Regions:
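Short Gly/Thr/Asp-enriched flexible loops that form oxyanion-binding sites at enzyme active sites
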Residues: 9-11, 66-84, 110
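Short hydrophobic/aromatic-enriched beta-strand-loop microsegments
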Residues: 18-25, 77-82, 117-125
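N-terminal small/polar loop signature for handling phosphorylated ligands or for N-terminal nucleophile
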Residues: 12-71
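Catalytic-loop motifs flanking and including active-site residues across diverse enzymes
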Residues: 6, 80-87, 105, 160-163
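Phosphate-binding and adjacent anionic-ligand microenvironments
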Residues: 57, 95-247
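Short, acidic/small-residue loops that bind anionic groups at enzyme active sites
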Residues: 77-94, 98, 124-126
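Rossmann-like NAD(P)H-binding beta-loop-alpha module
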Residues: 1-16
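Short acidic-glycine loop/turn motifs at beta-strand connectors
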Residues: 62-63, 72-74, 232-234, 243
Length: 247
């Protein structure tokens, strides 16, 4: 819970779910023990703890408890992109329906949705864009590939607590280890890179050029609701301007 509010509420949730746990950086004092973003490069401590054995899984949340990541029993990352995939798998198995995630998220959610007979719809990056699209298509589950789970039955907002409950329910229902659960989902690799440009760079012109270059290709689907996304048969590229960071 990286020394933030998660340390206040997570013990109550885990106890209610019958989970035995050990807290790392659980004191809610606001003094982060490391970079609080729940991604692999920041989680060496808890990954090492898991690798030493004796645990079924690791749970990591960010300071405001809206991003959620899991670590397998062997100390390897479950994958932040796959938090939503696993939760959606469980929700769709009980409540058939549609799903939504942002354009920069893994294709695995689409695959799982189709397997359950639903329809996957992409949205522009940003929680408000995802929730708006979820309402439009009456999605039963959605979110973002950074570990953000949005479950309308609870509320229209990213919520790691809801994600934990649904993920653990899926794990219990499947009756397998977390690494075995991970192996049941399509394996996609994803790289998220930031490109720092000079202020004089005309990013919009670049995006228009990319769209023009690939728009006539038969095997490429171009989406321009948020930058430009190019979907090839076995890969994709998404280029966009950040709304939260200078470029």
């Amino acid at each position: 819970s990286i020394n933030s509010v998660g340390g206040v509420i997570l013990p109550n949730l885990l106890k209610a779910l019958g989970v035995e746990y050990k807290f790392i950086n659980g004191e809610a004092n606001g003094e982060f023990a490391h970079n609080p973003e729940p991604i692999e490069k920041n989680l060496g401590g808890i990954m090492g703890e898991l690798a030493n054995g004796g645990y079924d899984l690791g749970i990591v949340v960010d300071p405001d408890v809206d991003r959620l990541a899991f670590i397998c029993e062997d100390g390897k990352m479950f994958g932040e992109e796959y938090t939503l995939v696993s939760v959606a798998d469980y929700v769709l198995s009980n409540t058939p329906g549609n799903t939504v995630s942002n354009l920069s998220s893994t294709r695995a959610l689409r695959d799982v949705t189709v397997n359950h007979g639903g329809v996957y719809t992409p949205a522009a990056v940003g929680e408000v864009n995802v929730t708006t699209k979820m309402k439009d298509v009456h999605a039963v589950i959605g979110g973002e590939g950074n570990g953000g789970v949005i479950y309308p039955e609870s509320h229209y907002g990213r919520d790691a607590l809801v994600g934990i409950a649904l993920f653990l329910s899926n794990l219990a229902h499947k009756g397998c280890s977390i690494s075995e659960l991970r192996a049941t989902y399509p394996e996609y690799c994803i790289a998220k890179n930031r490109i720092d440009l000079t202020p004089s760079t005309d990013v919009d012109a670049i995006l228009v050029k990319v769209k023009e270059m690939y728009g006539k290709e038969k095997d490429v689907t171009v989406t321009d609701i948020d930058g430009v996304k190019l979907d090839f048969p076995n890969k994709w590229v998404h280029l966009r301007k950040s709304n939260t960071e200078p470029i």
